[in-house]
UniProtKB/Swiss-Prot annotation:
Similarity-based family: Belongs to the universal ribosomal protein uL4 family.
A Pfam family reported for this protein in Swiss-Prot or TrEMBL: Ribosomal_L4
Region of interest (Disordered), residue spans: 1-28, 56-114, 224-245
Extent of Basic and acidic residues compositional bias: 59-71
Protein name: Large ribosomal subunit protein uL4
GO terms for biological process, alphabetical: translation
GO CC entries: ribonucleoprotein complex; ribosome
Record keyword Ribosomal protein present: yes
SUPFAM superfamilies: Ribosomal protein L4
Primary role: One of the primary rRNA binding proteins, this protein initially binds near the 5'-end of the 23S rRNA. It is important during the early stages of 50S assembly. It makes multiple contacts with different domains of the 23S rRNA in the assembled 50S subunit and ribosome. Forms part of the polypeptide exit tunnel.
Length: 245
């Protein structure tokens, strides 16, 4: 993961090239500044990522107390006259095979995180990658209509030759999904699944062109009066994506 930038540049739209499967450029596309060029809030990103990882925990851990362990129903020896410390059960915590004191029990680790906070964290993570020229757009990764892992990986390496790449492709794009779903260094996500954690743990983010359009157009509700100068389409698109997490 690259070092996150802490600069606070003015919010401006970015123009990036649209790459073709053969490695050439087939035009350009504009990345809205409200999504790809916003100030980075590291404490916010930390809070959102911690909450996301906590929510992924199963929480099914369980231990048995002295009342749940099998056996230990009778008093091991009489109360007085033995010279030993009095004991009431062989399943007390101090005995081998006894119950556990204050052990973990099933619980939920969910943390409530407002949608706007998750959306802002995702914008910050995407902006950091964009400022370091690590957000790319491709028209397609495979030429033709037949899935090809070799062709897709070759095209991907000409764009982002890094250790871990996040590829955002629509679910309907079976060509991309079938070509890359078995590549260990590539993580595939639908536009609606895009989240802060996966952006941060990836070195580069590669959008298929139609997936980028779907991400930015997702849930395009008009901006409210308190939204300030946020780009309505881009901001709500991020919120819509994080809502599914």
């Amino acid at each position: 993961m690259s070092r996150v930038a802490t600069s606070d540049p003015s919010v401006t739209a970015r123009t990036v090239a649209v790459h073709a499967p053969n490695g050439g450029e087939g035009g350009s596309v504009e990345l809205p500044g409200g999504v790809f060029d916003v100030p980075l809030n590291i404490p916010l990103i930390h809070q959102v990522v911690v909450a996301q990882l906590a929510a992924a925990r199963q929480g099914t851990h369980d231990t048995k107390t002295r009342g749940e362990v099998r056996g230990g129903g009778r008093k091991p020896y009489r109360q007085k006259g033995t010279g030993r410390a009095r004991q009431g059960s062989l399943r007390a915590p101090q005995f081998t095979g006894g119950g556990t004191v204050h052990g973990p029990t099933p619980r939920r680790y969910d943390q409530r995180t407002p949608k706007k906070m998750k959306a802002a964290a995702l914008r910050g993570a995407l902006s950091d990658r964009a400022r370091n020229n690590r957000v790319h757009v491709v028209s397609s990764l495979v030429s033709g209509e037949t899935p090809s892992t070799k062709s897709a990986v070759t095209a991907l390496r000409t764009i982002a030759d890094t250790r871990r790449v996040l590829v955002v492709a629509s679910r309907s794009d079976e060509l991309t999904w079938k070509s890359l779903r078995n590549v260990a260094a590539v993580h595939l996500l639908d536009p609606g699944q895009l989240n802060t954690y996966d952006v941060l743990v990836s070195d580069d983010v590669v959008f298929i062109e139609d997936a980028l359009a779907a991400f930015l157009a997702r849930d395009t509700r008009p901006a409210t009066s308190t939204a300030g100068t946020e780009a309505a389409a881009g901001t709500e698109g991020v919120a819509g994506a994080e809502e599914n997490k």
